[in-house]
Curated annotation (Swiss-Prot):
GO MF entry, a single one: undecaprenyldiphospho-muramoylpentapeptide beta-N-acetylglucosaminyltransferase activity
The name this protein goes by in its record: UDP-N-acetylglucosamine--N-acetylmuramyl-(pentapeptide) pyrophosphoryl-undecaprenol N-acetylglucosamine transferase
Membrane topology: Peripheral membrane protein
Taxonomic lineage: Bacteria, Bacillati, Bacillota, Bacilli, Bacillales
Species of origin: Staphylococcus aureus (strain JH9)
Residue ranges of the TM segments: none
PANTHER family (alphabetical): UDP-N-ACETYLGLUCOSAMINE--N-ACETYLMURAMYL-(PENTAPEPTIDE) PYROPHOSPHORYL-UNDECAPRENOL N-ACETYLGLUCOSAMINE TRANSFERASE (PTHR21015:SF27), UDP-N-ACETYLGLUCOSAMINE--N-ACETYLMURAMYL-(PENTAPEPTIDE) PYROPHOSPHORYL-UNDECAPRENOL N-ACETYLGLUCOSAMINE TRANSFERASE 1 (PTHR21015)
């Protein structure tokens, strides 16, 4: 029986693709295990949503693009992570490693290479991340969500496969969503998602605009961990720090979304044909990958986008109103999108690429 080791973590985006693939792997008769960090969000997500999967925690550092004394310390963490991962891989003897990226994945990919275990990497963003750039040197193949990403990668190693969406995404129950929120079925619902880490600026502007927003929408506000404001209580407004199992039910009642521009999230909104106003992480907080993702979706006519540096209460309301006027056009553009690979076909390709 073919055994696949999965790795990736640090943010929800580096875990959600694996969460969508592992159930398909199990249903097709593959064995699966997960290697991640000791305290990262991937451990919480995998152990809560896939308790049947063995989770192996390893030491991991952080990949920084700036000079810091912490970089020296993290060299030793990465080296220990390689040793930790080698120990796991020698014990489990997987046939291949599937890496979703994030800083925890690098020592695992290096360890796999040292044991002659073939690695397939997945890159969700339009431009490759630092972890995947490093890991690619030790990998057999890299799969991309955006076709344009192939321009940044060696032709002999890169293949475009499109987005990988979790199976339960379309199974959200609107009735459950309305019961969960207590919302009125006859009024539009706006979902605000600031990413797994949240956005203090976006949260502040939403709360500042709440009275105006509530005239047109009921608002579900995913604030990010530790950013919920218990003092803000209004009819038609509900806050969560983070939603796991109930997210599909909330998406089932969502008419419009304001969101960061992580690739996995925006492809889920695209699949569900939910018009989106994207506020990507700025260059002061990231390498600009979300800006590229957002601009690509805007160019395709799937979304509107606002730079966080330009985000004000007035601009937010203005862009939302314009998007509502273009709602039909945006949804029609979304209907032209087609998924490139089924998960079953993707696993067939993965096995062929890794083991041949």
């Amino acid at each position: 029986m073919t055994k696949i080791a999965f790795t990736g973590g640090g943010t929800v985006g580096h875990v959600s693709v694996n969460l969508s693939l592992i159930p398909t792997a199990l249903s097709q008769g593959y064995e699966a295990l997960y290697i991640g960090s000791k305290n990262g969000i991937e451990r919480e997500m995998i152990e809560s949503q896939l308790p049947e999967i063995k989770y192996y925690p390893i030491s991991s550092g952080k990949l920084r693009r700036y000079i810091s004394l912490e970089n020296a310390k993290d060299v030793f963490k990465v080296l220990k992570g390689i040793l930790d991962a080698r120990k796991v891989l020698k014990k489990e003897k997987p046939d291949l490693l599937f890496s979703k990226g994030g800083f925890v994945s690098v020592p695992v990919v290096i360890a796999a290479k040292s044991l002659n275990i073939p690695t397939i990497i997945h890159e969700s963003d339009l431009t490759p991340g630092l972890a995947n750039k490093i890991a690619l040197k030790f990998a057999k193949k890299i799969y991309t969500t955006f076709e344009e990403t192939l321009n940044y990668l060696p032709k002999e190693k890169a293949d475009f496969i499109g987005a990988t969406i979790r199976e339960d995404l379309k199974n959200g129950n609107a009735h459950n969503g309305y019961q969960l929120t207590g919302f009125n079925e006859n009024k539009k619902v706006l979902l605000v998602m600031g990413g797994s880490l949240g956005s203090k600026k976006l949260n502040s502007i939403i709360r500042e605009n709440l009275d105006a927003l509530l005239q047109q929408y009921q608002v579900i506000h995913l604030t990010g961990k530790g950013l919920k404001d218990a003092q803000v209580k209004k009819s038609g407004y509900i806050q969560y720090e983070f939603v796991k199992e109930d997210l599909t039910d909330l998406l089932a009642i969502t008419d419009t979304v304001i969101s960061r521009a992580g690739s996995n999230a925006i492809y889920e909104f695209l699949t569900l044909r939910i018009p989106m106003l994207l506020v990507p992480l700025g260059l002061d907080q990231s390498r600009g990958d979300q800006i590229d993702n957002a601009n690509h979706f805007a160019d395709k006519g799937y979304a509107k986008t606002i730079d966080e540096e330009q985000l004000t209460a007035q601009i937010l309301l203005q862009e939302l109103n314009e998007m509502e006027q273009e709602r039909t056009r945006i949804i029609n553009n979304m209907k032209s999108y087609e998924q490139s690979y089924t998960k079953e076909a993707l696993f067939d390709k993965m096995i062929k690429d890794a083991l041949n």
